[in-house]
Regions:
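Rossmann-fold dehydrogenase core element
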Residues: 110-128, 147-152
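Predominantly a Rossmann-like dinucleotide-binding segment in NAD(P)-dependent oxidoreductases
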Residues: 128-206
Length: 206
């Protein structure tokens, strides 16, 4: 692939795909988004037209099985991440996956072990580390400016992607509980915890 672009398939035609993932891939001249997949075919079609993506489909397994796809980008509802990631890893694909990979540590570790066995690259959607302010704080820690940290306290608040003209409720009352995030900790808490690990050190597995 030295002389060709990475061919990317995006699974999920939602807000993160629209405002972050697809624009990010398309800004990188080394990459090409070649297919967008969503259970709602008409939504995938709309995204394909909006972003000039050659193909759209509702068949995620067909996409994962394609030999001409290098990277699978998973930005679907949290409850679907593990199955999609696992199948992608089994197919030998590189993965960018929104957090969390799975709903429990055991499945997350299994996925990491499979990725290592397959020799593929994986990345979680923890973008806060790349914020200039967060990186500056890390530099201050590395330089010893604040001494040795022992406790990390944090809170997170933002209103990104919220339409001020619409109600704040993001989940329909009749939504399947198994298909939504279990808590705010899973959604916005996860990257804040990741920053803490990066700043002051994470847990060491023995």
């Amino acid at each position: 692939m030295k002389n060709s672009k990475l061919r990317v398939a995006v699974l999920g035609a939602g807000r993160w795909a629209e405002f972050a993932h697809i624009p990010g891939w398309q800004r990188d001249p080394r990459c090409e988004v070649v297919v967008i997949c969503d259970p709602l075919k008409e939504r995938a079609d709309d995204f394909a037209q909006q972003f000039s993506i050659p193909e759209s489909t509702s068949e995620w397994q067909v996409v994962i099985d394609r030999s001409d796809i290098d990277v699978i980008d998973i930005c679907t509802p949290s409850s679907t991440h593990f199955e999609l990631a696992w199948k992608s890893l089994e197919a030998g694909k590189h993965i960018l996956c929104e957090k969390p990979v799975a709903r429990n540590f055991r499945d997350t570790l299994r996925a990491a072990e499979l990725a290592e066995a397959k020799g593929v690259k994986t990345k979680l959607g923890f973008t806060f580390r790349y914020s200039p302010g967060v990186q500056f704080a890390r530099e201050m820690l590395d330089d010893g400016f604040v001494g040795t940290p022992y406790i990390y306290n944090a809170y997170e608040q933002n209103s990104q992607f919220l339409d001020p003209l619409n109600p704040i409720r993001q989940v329909k009352l009749d939504s399947d509980p198994a298909a939504i995030q279990t808590s705010s900790l899973e959604g916005y808490g996860a990257p804040v915890i990741d920053i803490g690990h990066w700043w002051v050190g994470g847990y060491q597995l023995e």
